[in-house]
Each structure stands twice: as C-alpha cells, then as structure tokens.
C-alpha cells in the first residue's frame, strides 16, 4: 500500500487539481526505516522489498490468470475465488462476451465492454508488431467453443468480433453485436457457476509486474534510468526493448495490466485523463481537470452544509 500511495503522491497532495500543476514528488518526504526519502525513492524502496520477499515474474504471463492460480509467485494481492468457500463473483468476463459466445461455454454474457481504438493502436493490433499479450487479453476475429467448434449468431452467421468497429454508440448499426475486441485474459473455467461469474481463478488485484513498472516510473521521475525494470516486464513476453520514458511506461502499463483496473488511476497520474481521444470528446471545461475527482453527492452536502461542491460540478 505504501508504494501505491507514494506513486500517486502528486495526486493525493494536490489541493487544486484544476490549475494544471502538480506537486513535485522529489519534494514530498517520508520517513522509511529511519531514513528520509522522497516519494520516488520510497516507491523504489518498497518495490525492492517485494523482491526480498521472493516475489518474481512468472515465466508465462497467462499463468497469473489460470484456473487455480493460487501458486503464482507473481500475484501479490488477489480476491480469492472458490465455489464452495466464497461468494465473490467476477463480473467483467460476463459483461464483455457476446451472448452466444458465453452460451457456448455454458455461461451467460451481456455483449458489453470492448477494447477502445486507442487500446488497439497501443497493442499494434493487426500489424506485424502486434504485442504478444493481445491474444491473451482479448477475443478478436472468429469465435470457437471449448471443443473447437465455430460459434454462430442467432441468424446462423459466424460470430466474428470486429475490433476496429468499436464506437461509443453502435445501436442500430450492422456491428451492434460484433463490434470490439472482448475481454479474455482469465482462463475459462468450465466448472464455473452463477453463469460463469463464480469461478476458481482468483481475481488479480496487484502483482509483481505492476511493482516493476512502478519502480521504473519512480526512477525516471527521480531523474534516473528505469530501462531495466521496464524491459524485464517486456522480455517476459519476448517484446522488443524500449527506453523507459514516461510515455513508454504508461503505454506498457496498458499492455501489461489490461483489464486489471488501473487505467483510470494511471491516466490521472500521468495527466492524461481529461483529454479527448478517438470518439470520446472532451467534456465542456474538462481542460481544467475537474473530472479528476467525482462530485460530492447532493445527499452528503445536505447532511453537511459546510461542504462545498468540487469545482466544475
């Protein structure tokens, strides 16, 4: 928790998030084991402690998301899943897959969340340089069931996910059922119950690869070189080496941590959250950064009349 707090120090200590300025992590100090460290040095220190605790990268990326993934030496914090002992449910997979795709696995689906155009571009989808993690994280193209048989739509045509047809609103378009690359990442548990939401794969919240990318980022922000940590993550999937610039680190976090719930926080930390991209327009006055935080609910302000609504709302 300390390393995650410190990597976001400039956000947490920013009293005015609408002035386009952030505190400098080099000037934010912590006492760590009797030593005064700045925010970035603190991140590096705690990430190194994970290595001392014998956390490491799994040789195979997908091992972290397999059925019965408890033995992973990379996963640090997970939500335990067990059909007998717990009632936790994984909603993401259920929401993303097409109805017939999920049905072919004996599950159910909502035909929902898909990869954005920006995500496809970051992964290099469809190019010779496509990142190896795309096929692990996303379903795209023709779909097959667990026995290898083709999956069809209700009209008898083959179910083909079309990643580039994704848009904010595809209602009443020819691609209403098939637009977008869908969430994959977790190995399909054929014994899952509750329409596939109660599975044996533990839900991964934080793992060592994330810590390595945090360390790389902290080193760069502190004026050092973070190439080793960035390329340690990339070499695991045999991706080409890259220099550890902030732009490349943010890109790598999207590649490595897809569907793991960090993107919004990352974009805020890198000052990219309020920009327009692809078909997502910038909201009125969003250049001020006001959407970095949520509005205070009106019922809370009624309970405490001294609270002033956050700027922009």
Residue locations for each model-derived region?
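An aromatic- and glycine-enriched ligand-binding surface/loop that stacks and positions planar moieties
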Residues: 10-166
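C-terminal substrate/ligand-recognition segments
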Residues: 132-233
């Amino acid at each position: 928790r300390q390393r995650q707090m410190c990597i976001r120090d400039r956000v947490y200590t920013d009293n005015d998030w609408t002035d386009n300025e952030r505190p400098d992590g080099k000037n934010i100090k912590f006492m760590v084991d009797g030593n005064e460290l700045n925010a970035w040095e603190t991140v590096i220190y705690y990430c190194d402690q994970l290595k001392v605790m014998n956390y490491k990268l799994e040789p195979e990326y997908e091992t972290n998301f397999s059925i019965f993934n408890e033995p992973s030496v990379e996963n640090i914090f997970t939500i335990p899943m067990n059909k007998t002992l717990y009632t936790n449910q994984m909603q993401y997979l259920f929401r993303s897959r097409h109805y017939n795709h999920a049905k072919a696995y004996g599950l159910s689906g909502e035909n929902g969340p898909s990869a954005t155009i920006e995500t496809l571009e970051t992964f290099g989808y469809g190019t010779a340089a496509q990142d190896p993690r795309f096929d692990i994280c996303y379903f795209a193209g023709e779909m097959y069931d667990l026995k290898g048989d083709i999956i069809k739509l209700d009209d008898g045509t083959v179910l083909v996910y079309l990643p580039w047809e994704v848009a904010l609103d595809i209602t009443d378009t020819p691609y209403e059922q098939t637009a977008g690359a869908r969430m994959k990442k977790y190995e399909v548990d054929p014994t899952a119950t509750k329409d596939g939401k109660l599975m044996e794969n533990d839900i991964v919240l934080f793992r060592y690869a994330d810590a390595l990318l945090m360390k790389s980022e902290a080193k760069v922000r502190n004026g050092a070189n973070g190439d080793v940590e960035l390329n340690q993550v990339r070499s695991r999937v045999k991706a080409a080496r890259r220099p550890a610039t902030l732009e490349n680190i943010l890109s790598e976090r999207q590649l490595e941590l897809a569907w793991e719930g960090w993107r919004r926080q990352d974009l805020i930390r890198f000052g990219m959250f309020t920009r327009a991209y692809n078909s997502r327009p910038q909201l009125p006055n969003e250049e001020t950064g006001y959407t970095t935080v949520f509005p205070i609910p009106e019922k809370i302000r009624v309970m405490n009349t001294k609270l002033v609504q956050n700027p922009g709302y």
